[in-house]
Amino acid sequence: MPTYNRYDMSRVIETYVVNPKYRQVLQLRYVEGLTHEQVAEVAGYSTQHVKSICKNYKNYLISLL
């Protein structure tokens, strides 16, 4: 079973949760349950950028587990 260190987890939290740009996208996508297209419209980003943020966030979390 792979292990993670606290620095890796804090880096993920700092990058995706503390940063307001990413926090808004992640909240709209995972808390509010909006589609990528709806999140892009509300946040003012392209759909591809929203997909990229969500994919990178999930990959970081998966890599830590």
PLM region descriptions:
Residues 17-32:
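Short amphipathic alpha helix immediately N-terminal
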Residues 49:
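Residues in the helix-turn-helix
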Residues 53-56:
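Residues within the DNA-recognition helix of helix-turn-helix
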Residues 58-65:
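Short, Lys/Arg-enriched C-terminal cap helix and immediately downstream tail that follows
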